[in-house]
Regions:
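Metal-dependent peptidase/peptidase-like ectodomains
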Residues: 122-124, 239-251, 337, 346-450
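Soluble metallo-hydrolase cores and metallopeptidase-like ectodomains found primarily
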Residues: 35-40, 114, 121-157, 227-314, ...
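Zn-dependent metallopeptidase/amidohydrolase metal-coordination segment
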Residues: 294, 301, 428-477
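N-terminal hydrophobic or amphipathic helices/low-complexity stretches enriched
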Residues: 31-92, 154, 215, 288-290, ...
């Protein structure tokens, strides 16, 4: 069964009124706060840790409830950001003279009417079992347990027409990469078993996988997201893959059990939004070109409580990038560059880079006028002097000019960061280059890099709180981004695209 719903929250009309009022004040506010010319070569002194800390605790506090993409909380946080930009003195650069560019995201999930039974155990998706993909299924078959699924284990059992249960086993990479190893292994092995004749696959966690069952399965509850018509909106039928906790192992082993699974799928449409603002350039010709400072305002919202905390605030991911981008805006307002500075806070990044994908497809300035993208993604954790540029080395580097500008600027702030290069390599298990908002721009040959301080143990957990952020580090990375952008924004020539640039996937 497929159900389609078009969801616009009942309180959205009140939000629309607020947005309208903000549009009115944005125009008048900009007229009253035009950037001053200033006398300094740049305005790096406008980037202050006190501003960054204040904004961080506001945006990543419980008031905005984790800013989940497609929710009223994301919209409320977006209005707050736009109001800060108006007060700073930026010009609205979204649709229809506002700070906003609205778009729709489509969500596909497993319905509450879906049923899952193994023997006498009635299981609920999202609680004591998780179905890995929201696909239509109807299975009623004998369950066979095949140990850890080794060739020797499988040789002893006829799996054709059966639901196959197996215990997860295998030592993966370190914790920060284990999640991708876990899901990759489960999906790959399940595909092999289904190809060999299994009609369903049931995974039971081992001790290491169990911690991820408890921490990372909230995304499976949500389902899949995409822009309308995107690949994740397609609803299809397939043999189900089920994930169980380690506590299920003893009863799953029992012989003679029946596996019954009826999966129904439903689809929803939600509003999300990009926030777009600019500081016009001062050069009569170059002001028609833009250097784009990119970030995203959404996170994971309200989810299953961990240690009593159900609000996943996303202080590092990515309130840190947002407050940095606001600080960059203050500097460009104080001292405009020759080229225009464009600031884009992308919505629904956590749902699959949806806001940046939408903006690249429907930019509010001519796409060819964007000379470079500097993306801020998680810049507030780990060692104070460590950082990473995504897009620094081939095949991810698409502009040596832009990368060299960033490397030079790294030596000019008084805090020279030691740059990690491993996470930008194509064989890194996290595939970090492909997971932030610079990517859609790079795919259309716009010079693009991302500044990041990389993952940490609180990534996508309720422990990603503002109290854990190194605001001094955020300030220093912001100044580094500023000097890079200031350089590019004032050069006579725009940075060139590397000849033959092609991503590995």
């Amino acid at each position: 069964m497929i159900r389609h719903k078009y969801l616009f929250p009942q309180s959205l009309p009140r939000l629309a009124v607020l947005l309208g009022l903000l549009f009115i004040t944005s125009v008048s506010g900009y007229a009253q706060s035009k950037p001053s010319a200033g006398k300094s070569a740049n305005a790096i002194s406008a980037i202050r840790e006190s501003d960054i800390k204040r904004d961080l605790f506001a945006l990543a506090g419980d008031h905005f409830r984790g800013r989940e993409g497609g929710s009223l909380d994301e919209l409320k946080a977006s209005v707050w950001i736009a109001e800060q930009l108006r007060a700073i003195g930026l010009q609205p650069a979204g649709d229809d003279g506002t700070f906003f560019q609205f778009f729709h995201i489509q969500r596909t999930r497993i319905t509450e009417t879906s049923r899952l039974n193994i023997g006498s155990h009635q299981l609920t998706h999202g609680e004591d079992a998780f179905i890995l993909a929201p696909a239509i299924a109807s299975v009623d078959a004998p369950l066979v347990f095949v140990g850890t699924g080794t060739p020797d284990d499988l040789a002893k059992v006829d799996i054709k027409g059966k639901a196959v249960a197996l215990a997860f086993s295998g030592t993966g990479p370190p914790e920060l990469s284990y999640r991708r190893f876990l899901f990759g292994t489960m999906n790959r092995k399940a595909a092999e078993l289904i190809k060999a004749g299994a009609v369903a696959v049931v995974w039971v966690s081992d001790a290491q996988a169990q911690s991820y069952f408890e921490r990372w399965t909230t995304g499976l509850e949500r389902g899949r997201y995409d822009l309308p018509g995107g690949p994740n909106t397609r609803i299809f039928s397939q043999a189900p893959t089920v994930w169980l906790p380690a506590s299920a192992l003893e009863w799953v082993k029992q012989p003679g059990q029946q596996f019954t699974n009826v999966v129904n799928v439903e689809s929803f449409s939600y509003p999300s939004v990009n926030i777009v603002a600019k500081v016009p350039g001062t050069d009569p010709t170059l002001k028609n070109e833009h250097i784009l400072f990119s970030t995203h305002q959404d996170h994971d919202g309200v989810r299953r409580a961990v240690a009593g905390d159900s609000i996943w605030n996303g202080a590092d991911d990515n309130a840190s990038g947002c407050v940095a981008t606001m600080a960059l805006a203050r500097a460009f307002v104080q001292k405009p560059a020759k080229r225009s500075a464009l600031f884009v806070f992308h919505g629904a990044e956590e749902r699959g880079l949806l806001g940046s994908r939408y903006y690249v497809d429907k930019p509010t300035v001519p796409r060819e006028s964007i000379v470079a993208v500097l993306n801020a993604e998680m810049i507030g954790r780990n060692a104070p002097d460590s950082a990473c540029i995504l897009g620094q080395q081939p095949p991810h580097r698409n502009s040596a000019d832009l990368v060299n500008a960033a490397l030079t600027a790294n030596t000019l702030t008084g805090m020279t960061f030691k740059l990690d290069t491993l996470w930008d390599k194509p064989d890194h298990p996290e595939g970090w280059y492909f997971r932030s908002d610079h990517l859609p721009y790079a795919r259309v040959n716009i010079p693009a890099i991302a500044f990041t301080s990389l993952l940490h143990v609180d990534y996508h957990t309720p422990k990603d709180e503002p109290e854990r952020i190194d605001t001094s580090k955020v300030t220093n990375i912001t100044r580094w981004m500023y000097l890079t952008g200031w350089d590019i924004a004032n050069r006579p020539q725009r940075p060139a695209i590397d000849k033959g640039f092609k991503l590995e996937r």
